[in-house]
Amino acid sequence: MSAKTKVKTKKSRNSKVPASLVWFEIPADDIKRARKFYSSLFGWKIKAFPNMEDYWHIDSGGAHASPDRAIMKKMCPEHPVTNYILVDSVTRASAKVEKLGGKVHKAKTAVPNLGYFAICQDTENNVFALWEKIESAK
């Protein structure tokens, strides 16, 4: 790797590097069936996410397993798996998505006590999400 392309990052054992895949959601028509499928296939422990209807957290190996994941109620027949990518600022990254020809379908939204996200679409019509971890989010 040349000096120009080498990227140095500082992170603790428990932190994620910006641009890392940090979360994904699996949409399901039948959550019970999806829970059974994935827990049987991979041994994932799947539990209801606090204060969220039809949203289930998947534990695939403890607190430091990465990326984190969830099963949720499918919102439409074409609902894709959504990958959440860590960014320093959802606001700045959303603006950059649009500048580069992508679209922001759901603007910056708070997940109380966890952070902010935005749902975007790239130039090839792939859906993805931006994630900014801020525990003071309201």
Model-inferred region functions:
Residues 2-35, 64, 81-83, 132-138:
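N-terminal beta-strand motif that seeds the catalytic metal site of vicinal oxygen chelate
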Residues 49-54, 110-113, 137-138:
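Short glycine/proline-centered loop/turn elements that form peptide/ligand docking sites
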